[in-house]
Structure formats: C-alpha cells, structure tokens
Design a protein with these regions (language model features):
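Extreme N-terminal basic, low-complexity initiation segments
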Residues: 1-13
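Short, basic/aromatic-enriched C-terminal tail that caps enzymatic domains
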Residues: 237-257
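N-terminal polybasic/positive-inside topogenic patches
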Residues: 7, 30-31
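Composition-driven detection of intrinsically disordered, low-complexity segments
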Residues: 11, 34-37
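Conserved alpha/beta-domain cores
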Residues: 36-223, 229-231, 237-239, 253
C-alpha cells in the first residue's frame, strides 16, 4: 500500500494554520515550511468566474469541469483544495502522480485524476492505475499502446486527443489537417474518445485556437473540449470548453527545482 510521507509544518501560508501535511521529495522538505508565494485566488472566486462565463455564453455552469492542475505544487496546497471539497485534479507526469495521489486517495474519496502532460508508451499501464482521463493522446503509437493495454485488462480511461493547433515544433499533438484521420484511427481502435485538447501558442490569441479546436470537434461529433488555463479559461468557455485546466490561479505560482 502506498503511503504519503508526512511532515510537520510549523507555520502555514495561504491561510493554512500549519499542522501535519503529506510531503513530496523535491518540493516540500520534511520538517520545513513551504516557501512563501503570492496567495492564490480563493476557489469560490474561480467558481464565480466560471459561472459568469458560462452564463454569458448561454451555458449551464455544470457544463464546465474545473481541473485543478496540481503539478509541481506543494502537497499542503493540494490538501487545502481537497479540504474545500474539490476532487478533480490534473497532473503532468505519471511519476509525480504516483508519488502523491495513492496517499491522498487513502484520505479522500471520489478523487478524479486527469493526466494532462505527455505520456510515454512504456508508462501506459501505470497511467491506467492512476488516471480516470488522459488528455494527451498525441500520436498513433500511443493510441495503439493504450488500446493494447485496454484489451489486456478490460477497461480504459477516457481519452482526449491532442491537436497542435499552432503547429509548433516543440509541442506534441497532431496537426489540424491530420486531426480527422487521427480521430477515426482512435475510434477504430475502440478507444473511448471524449474530445480534443489543445495548448495555444503563448504569443498568439488563444481564442482563435479554441475556435479551431471546437470546429474540428464539431465536425467529428465530439462533445469534449479540453482547453483554457489560468490566464484564458474565460475565453475558452466562450468557445465551448468543457474542461478547463487551472493551476496557478488556484494554487499560486509553482515552485520548481
């Protein structure tokens, strides 16, 4: 059985009164308080912004799923969000998720974990044990590996297919002109394709990429759109996002290193 190591934090941040918290090597050292950062936005404020955006778009607030992106976040911050009742989280790496979430699942019921970062083919089986949804199916080789493991064990996480809407060399995902064929291939493999995911270029207007992703999804009868992050999720909702991936706005700035 997995266990999350505990550390004693003598004084907390972001409203935390201190106490015993799970800790992860390399982010929060046992016996030390986390580094002080700018306070995150209260979760109810994020929810209010989502509600306002969905109302403006003529949609129900329940049509948008808030994924709290906890990658590289100190576990005291993650625990604080869990204590507020939120249960939908996103991680970027299988290894980090495996070091963190089995322990939290011993303490909290109903955790819904989403993989939003790149997945290596040799990590697929491990990902099946951790995640309910994989947002980053970005190439045929990975799709085939997922289908093979699903056949072996009899179940499969929901999947989103990643489209490189900006056609950037440094980003994963199929190009927009390859998306229709990739969707068809994944469906032929009997993968539970729920929608599409994109990460717009940092120096371009996000809404143009959200609109492109929505157009590709619509012509392929896909309802799910995983798009929008802390700085642009309201624009994504206006373009039809069903899953928004919000990290720093909830948890504060990440602590790398």
């Amino acid at each position: 059985m997995h266990r999350v190591a505990m550390c004693i934090v003598s004084s907390g941040i972001d409203g935390d009164a201190g106490g015993a918290w799970p800790c992860r090597a390399g982010v929060v050292k046992c016996g030390e308080a986390p580094l002080k950062q700018e306070p995150p936005m209260p979760l109810p404020d994020i929810t209010a912004r989502i509600n306002a955006s969905t109302t403006a778009a003529g949609r129900s607030p329940s049509s948008v799923h808030l994924i709290a992106v906890s990658k590289v976040q100190p576990n005291d911050r993650v625990e604080a969000v869990l204590q507020e009742g939120h249960r939908v989280f996103g991680e970027n790496r299988v290894q980090e998720a495996d070091s963190k979430w089995p322990g939290f699942r011993e303490l909290y019921d109903g955790i819904d974990l989403h993989l939003i970062g790149p997945l290596q083919s040799n990590k697929v089986r491990q990902a099946f044990d951790l995640f309910q949804t994989i947002h980053s199916v970005d190439r045929p080789k990975l799709a085939k590996a997922i289908a093979r493991i699903a056949d072996e064990i009899g179940h499969c996480p929901d999947v989103f297919l990643q489209v490189n809407t900006g056609e950037e060399d440094q980003k994963a995902g199929v190009s927009p002109d390859q998306a229709d064929a990739f969707i068809a291939e994944c469906r032929a493999l009997a993968l539970p394709v729920k929608g599409l995911m994109c990460i717009p270029p940092a120096d371009e207007e996000s809404s143009l990429h959200f609109a492109l992703l929505a157009k590709i999804a619509a012509r392929n009868d896909l309802a799910g759109l995983s798009m929008g992050m802390s700085g642009d999720f309201e624009s994504a909702i206006a373009q039809g996002a069903t899953h928004i991936r919000v990290g720093s706005a909830i948890f504060g700035e990440r602590q790398y290193g």
